[in-house]
């Protein structure tokens, strides 16, 4: 009998589905973190495949900062309604009461209070012992050395020196009470893999990933899209229409657009084939200080 050979994408798909099923079987109260971006959309698609024709055996959790793009909120609510997902939305109540925002308080404080602390609060509130995330190793250097099962202590902290071996796809999910595991089923995928899979599987994505004329300003070497009237224009800044798209999505004041003509998935894939820069070049939170992503993860970030 001739052995069937899986394509590169089907191998990645099979690995991710295996990981998702393993977590669902091994942990008592898992959750899938849903940030509404392309990686979350792929991860959610894989989870649906993993348990088809049944429903997802865990909820989705969106840690909301209040500063996502309007199109992201619309996409989130439409997706949850269309597939009848159990979507939990959590916002740090203390941060909301203090009016924490990226313009006044800066990216570091905004991210720490509204994202890191918000996530930790949500995980504690619902008692989740495992949380799926859409991070990939090719995105950023601290993520490159993180395991698929990322152990977190009772304070949700990550210690890069205290990681468990993962030989031959064997994952150690043994934890004590109060500890948890962050699980990254897309660890071995690249940005190009993600886009090719989205095209292959016809996965719905937020339209912001496709190039269109959008209102932007130039600030600190970044093209910031003006998404609502909370924009804090500085002297000399002028809003202008440019043909841009986003390679990564987050809070709109902290996420830079790139000039592009790629209006279709094949055009995005073609653009990725010649790209020499990281998709996270437009994320302001990665510029806070040297090693800022690893520091954030040590403190409990995604």
Swiss-Prot record:
Coiled coil: none annotated. Its EC number is 2.7.7.4. It catalyses: sulfate + ATP + H(+) = adenosine 5'-phosphosulfate + diphosphate. The keyword Nucleotidyltransferase applies. GO terms for biological process: hydrogen sulfide biosynthetic process; sulfate assimilation. Signal peptide: none annotated. NCBIfam families: CysD, PRK05253.1, PRK12563.1. This is Sulfate adenylyltransferase subunit 2. It comes from Zymomonas mobilis subsp. mobilis (strain ATCC 31821 / ZM4 / CP4).
